[in-house]
Amino acid sequence: MRFSRFIIGLTSCIAFSVQAANVDEYITQLPAGANLALMVQKVGASAPAIDYHSQQMALPASTQKVITALAALIQLGPDFRFTTTLETKGNVENGVLKGDLVARFGADPTLKRQDIRNMVATLKKSGVTQIDGNVLIDTSIFASHDKAPGWPWNDMTQCFSAPPAAAIVDRNCFSVSLYSAPKPGDMAFIRVASYYPVTMFSQVRTLPRGSAEAQYCELDVVPGDLNRFTLTGCLPQRSEPLPLAFAVQDGASYAGAILKDELKQAGITWSGTLLRQTQVNEPGTVVASKQSAPLHDLLKIMLKKSDNMIADTVFRMIGHARFNVPGTWRAGSDAVRQILRQQAGVDIGNTIIADGSGLSRHNLIAPATMMQVLQYIAQHDNELNFISMLPLAGYDGSLQYRAGLHQAGVDGKVSAKTGSLQGVYNLAGFITTASGQRMAFVQYLSGYAVEPADQRNRRIPLVRFESRLYKDIYQNN
């Protein structure tokens, strides 16, 4: 009996040694200095098929969205909807609303200006033509900063990093056109569509075509209060305008200006002022409302397209719903940790969760922890309907054109979430092997860097690495 146990143990050691040797061969495809933590395990199995630094902490990047989605489904449920309302505690007399109009924003990441227009139209149809009171922008569902700890400061004005505020309209992103001046040395000028309630100032100097100075004189944007932006730097002369897009920094101010304009366009006047309401108040009578699509539909978009805005509003909403407090980053983090431990049996230990999207550089997680999450998802997928929300290699989302997986011949066989930051290329999800087995895998690859001269072909080593790795996983399990 002891001898048989010794043989089994020896066989396991040999297997793991072979695994490590094989993984080391894959790593030779990567740029020098790259760090890999990898874990592959059959769904329902007690031991991994590949365990390579699975306890090593790493930046999850957008694989964090897998955790956010699971916690959201458990806490909020697949049918949850974000709700935006127009409310009042006043009465309507002869077309005059005697009291304040409250626009209660519920952090709907999909709310559009047209939705606000429709709600105002409903208000008008109810007989209101004048408001004898103030217009309040209620953002009390969230509190504290709208930007998570650890977000790179230079990404703050990019639309993919738009602050997930309580008040969001058209993803809190706006577009402008930058025109070079006819004469070199003069300031370029900016055109902003009138329906964007923002102010842009140009301090951009126009350079002659082909100017050597353009290489190091870059465009930059400096945000100010109340969605005022200053564009600085240089722009070589060009015949066509340069299209640019920026993230709104003050969601409440932006939404308030849009509501103010829509009331004006509808012919509804008011005697008071536009104010922000941040303290929780008793709701009034709802006169108009807009609901988002069901949560499951939003999570599918979030996972397929790696939508940061949805991820972070959902994350903050989880904290709000779990603890009945305004949604903050800390509340979201504590709620996710508690939900996974108490309702999914997943103890994430010393994992650091700073946001829901994975944009924060403060996030840290080990592949072994993410593997626990994936195993729970796979074993409860009948009720969660989760795996179908993940990008499918070769077909949709962020895996549609993943060259390494295509070369590995696993199009349609891999459902996984991608995660990319500077020097980070992650994957976490599932592969159906040639024998029909479903295996979960976590690939955390960081420290990926190439020489400046090789930037154009920087992904070639990644393609080689992933094509060999996933081809072997597919064929040999």
Specify the residue positions occupied by each region the protein language model found.
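Bacterial N-terminal signal peptides
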Residues: 7-15
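Generic beta-strand/beta-sheet core signal
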Residues: 41, 232, 273, 354, ...
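Small-residue-rich helix-loop
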Residues: 49-51, 112, 315-477
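Short active-site loop at a secondary-structure junction
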Residues: 51-71
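Bacterial N-terminal signal peptides that target proteins for export
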Residues: 1-7
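Beta-lactamase-like hydrolase cores
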Residues: 18-57, 83, 117-126
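Conserved serine DD-peptidase/penicillin-binding transpeptidase domain
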Residues: 22-27, 75-348, 468, 472-476
